[in-house]
Amino acid sequence: MKIESVTALVVNARQRNWVFVKMVTDQPGLIGWGEATIEWNTRAVVGAVEDAADFLVGEDPRRTEHLWQVLYRQRFFRGGAVVMSAISGIDQALHDIKAKDLGVPLYQLLGGLVRDRVRLYDHLGGGDTDAVYNDAAADRFAERAREIVGRGFTALKILAVPRTGMLDGVYGVRQAVGLMSAVREAVGDDVEVMVDLHGRTTPAMAIQYGHALAPLRPWFLEEPCPPGNVAALAEVARALPIPIATGERLVTRYEFREVLEQRACAVIQPDACHCGGISELKRIAAMAEPYFVSVAPHNPVGPIGTMAAIHFALSTPNFLIQEVMSADVPWRAEVVDQPLEIYQGHVLPPTRPGLGVEVDERAAARYAQGPEPKLRYFHPDGAVADW
């Protein structure tokens, strides 16, 4: 079996563009799909997929590990979010082909089932965070939280923290507590609520937020400070009684290594579309296991990336919970046939071979790449603010 072509297919998804990787083999009808979506870098990642294709055409797609090593090691410059997103989508497509060729769901090649269902959580913002978060209204937060729980979810995540300066006053902390209080009152104590700080805060501010939110029992506090300083993250983790989660902007096991060694979090959140694909996601999870760190994969992307994460979750012992986007664009199901059987906030194991997805390329063409919104956020004094 040989790879004949590797191409990128771009679909507009409003807040971002989905970047799908299509891998065609010389076997009639045997096509692999993956996802390399990375926010606000669409043209860059498409180019990275095209560059990688030169290393793949003519190769046997069943040599998944060998081809991962070729793409990672034989181009001298390693890592980086754009290149690793391209490798991630390609790696997913390789696994899809291999499992389809054998006629089994992908999780069977990843060690088989270690659980019979995968717990999911929804994000309060769905696929359009600005629509929910810009006015930061407590009643809107409560209404949206009740709607999510009404659909059977037993866990949800909120972004309750405003864009924060280096050392702000009490306004932001009061706002976060007010919003979290409204959500907790709306859903009760039996629903887990995670709070995302989105890397907006310094360690000093993150500690203030954490202590203020602790009585409301967040399940975990996500990305309390930007990536790049693991010692600062570890400082936050030691100072708070709330488990810390991080990792959505980290790629490869090499960037997760220091986080684990410094005991900087209780939950890691690698993204199957960024970190290096399914191959690297499994390695990162295995690294985390002896540190008693669980894995809650980051997943605000498209339906193919979601299926990759589901197969990972079904086959990984230290998996915790899976993020899904339930309300990004109404044409999601039109573009990708994604066989998710969801019951009471859980998804059951898919039964189709491979990842289990089918892409309607004609539908995808109707929703081709669109302009992504420009993230231009500033503090009142005009200084740049983090998204």
Question: Where are the language model's segments positioned?
Answer:
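Structured beta-strand/loop patches that form or line metal/cofactor-binding pockets in enzymes
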Residues: 1-33, 37, 44, 328-335, ...
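Metal-dependent enolase-superfamily TIM-barrel catalytic cores that perform enediolate-based chemistry
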Residues: 117-239
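Glycine-rich, aromatic-flanked loop segments that form ligand/cofactor-binding clefts
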Residues: 91-132
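Conserved, mostly hydrophobic/aromatic
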Residues: 3, 29, 52, 90, ...
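Metal- or metallocofactor-binding catalytic centers and their adjacent structured scaffolds
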Residues: 26-102
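Extended hydrophobic packing segments that form well-structured cores
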Residues: 355-387
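Shared catalytic-loop signature of beta/alpha-barrel
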Residues: 23, 47, 52, 66, ...
